[in-house]
């Protein structure tokens, strides 16, 4: 089945409140100095939901509470997020605090307790100041205005320099359906689902099981293919909510527009993943690695992520040095079976290696292209038909400075 790309359009200035039924709010309650630090997304109706969580064995209290909510009801109506404190490694008291946040949210928004998800991001190992949290939740008044959605996107940030939002419109059953997303993430990014949070809203009519299948698959190709510093976080999660208020027929794998929905969801996740990679702590450049001609998609993704995660590749890109030897070395370290004699590498569309032979190129032209904000590395294996991509950023002096002083 061909994906109806023509029926998918990016919505400029769209946000998580663009899909029908959603409102949002972000505000400052004092968890961070002079910055927004508490937010909420609320749906007019119980929404079908799906989620993907960190694979870090240490999982923060809010993540455990959210898992409990989604497993119990398979629907959500509100998400409460705080930044500035991760509520991770805070013992039984931390878990009690996360459950209290869920109760407070349910009471404040007038929804069932198990319809509330909780997320936190920030410093690990510090108890939540619940007196501030309690007062803060009581002040949340979500609205359907775009500016409140943007306020939410600010409230979930930690060391991020920019907010991360995206929105698409698609046609399902001949009706307009919207899907949007917001994310935070800058450091500790090396997901298998890093610190990374993402929230997706849509007015598509889709049930939990189907949405979960789609989100899990797409996460593997998008969020799990970004890396900033090779660390995974205790708090990462991606949550999707579907209000169903577009009033289409239920979307499932047999639906004529199934691939249209999947493609739109993938575009949202890919946009957010790239924005996270580009906003890596201290980053000055986005790095995209595409591996083509692999035997399997998994092998292509593994090689791409190996390259983009290499500190030597990252520092070379930061220094605008076309040291492709670091790229070929990373390929060899990936533990994927390759044929060194068939590999081709291009850097910013300039061939640097072909059939194990170094290629002559203009140093001046290469230097100019490496000054660009987005760097693309293409690797051609010539072993099969599969492809895979990964995204990351350069490694700068500023990264060390930011993380050396994070708590202070």
UniProtKB/Swiss-Prot annotation:
Catalyzes two activities which are involved in the cyclic version of arginine biosynthesis: the synthesis of N-acetylglutamate from glutamate and acetyl-CoA as the acetyl donor, and of ornithine by transacetylation between N(2)-acetylornithine and glutamate. The record marks 194-195 as: Cleavage. HAMAP family: ArgJ (MF_01106). The gene is argJ. This is Arginine biosynthesis bifunctional protein ArgJ. GO terms for biological process: L-arginine biosynthetic process; ornithine biosynthetic process. Substrate binds at residues 158, 184, 195, 281, 403, 408. Its EC number is 2.3.1.35, 2.3.1.1. It catalyses: N(2)-acetyl-L-ornithine + L-glutamate = N-acetyl-L-glutamate + L-ornithine; L-glutamate + acetyl-CoA = N-acetyl-L-glutamate + CoA + H(+). It comes from Bacillus thuringiensis subsp. konkukian (strain 97-27). The active site is at 195 (nucleophile). InterPro entries: Arg_biosynth_ArgJ, ArgJ-like_dom_sf, ArgJ_beta_C. The keyword Protease does not apply. The record marks 121-122 as: Involved in the stabilization of negative charge on the oxyanion by the formation of the oxyanion hole. Heterotetramer of two alpha and two beta chains. It comes from the Bacteria. Belongs to the ArgJ family.
């Amino acid at each position: 089945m061909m994906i109806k790309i023509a029926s998918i359009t990016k919505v400029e200035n769209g946000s998580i409140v663009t899909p029908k039924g959603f409102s949002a709010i972000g505000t400052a309650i004092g968890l961070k100095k002079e910055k927004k630090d508490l937010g909420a997304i609320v749906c007019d109706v119980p929404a079908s939901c799906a989620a993907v969580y960190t694979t870090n064995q240490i999982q923060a209290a809010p993540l455990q509470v959210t898992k409990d909510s989604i497993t119990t009801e398979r629907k959500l109506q509100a998400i409460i997020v705080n930044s500035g404190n991760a509520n991770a490694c805070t013992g039984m008291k931390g878990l009690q605090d996360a459950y209290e946040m869920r109760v407070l949210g349910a009471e404040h928004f007038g929804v069932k307790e198990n319809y509330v998800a909780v997320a936190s991001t920030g410093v690990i190992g510090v108890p939540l100041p619940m007196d501030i949290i309690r007062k803060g939740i009581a002040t949340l008044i979500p609205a359907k205005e775009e500016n409140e959605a943007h306020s939410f996107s600010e409230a979930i940030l930690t060391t991020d320099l920019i907010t991360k939002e995206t929105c698409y419109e698609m046609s399902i059953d001949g009706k307009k359906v919207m899907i949007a997303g917001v994310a935070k993430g800058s450091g500790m990014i090396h997901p298998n689902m890093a610190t990374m949070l993402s929230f997706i809203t849509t007015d598509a009519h889709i049930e939990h099981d189907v949405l979960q299948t789609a989100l899990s698959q797409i996460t593997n190709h998008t969020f799990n293919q970004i890396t900033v510093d090779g660390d995974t976080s205790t708090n990462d999660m991606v949550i999707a909510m579907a209000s169903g208020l577009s009033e289409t027929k239920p979307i499932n794998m047999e639906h004529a527009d199934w691939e249209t929905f999947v493609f739109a969801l993938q575009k949202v996740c890919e946009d957010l993943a790239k924005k996270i990679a580009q906003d890596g702590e201290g980053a000055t450049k986005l790095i995209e690695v595409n591996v083509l001609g692999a035997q399997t998609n998994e092998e292509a993704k593994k090689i791409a992520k190996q390259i983009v995660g290499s500190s030597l590749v990252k520092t070379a890109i930061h220094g605008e040095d076309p040291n492709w030897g670091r790229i070929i070395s990373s390929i060899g370290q990936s533990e994927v079976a390759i044929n060194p004699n068939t590999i081709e590498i291009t850097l910013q569309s300039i061939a640097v290696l072909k059939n194990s032979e170094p290629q002559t190129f203009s140093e001046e032209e290469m230097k100019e292209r490496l000054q660009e904000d987005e760097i693309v590395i293409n690797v051609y294996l010539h072993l099969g038909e599969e492809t895979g991509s990964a995204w990351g950023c350069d490694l700068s002096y500023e990264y060390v400075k930011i993380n050396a002083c994070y708590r202070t």
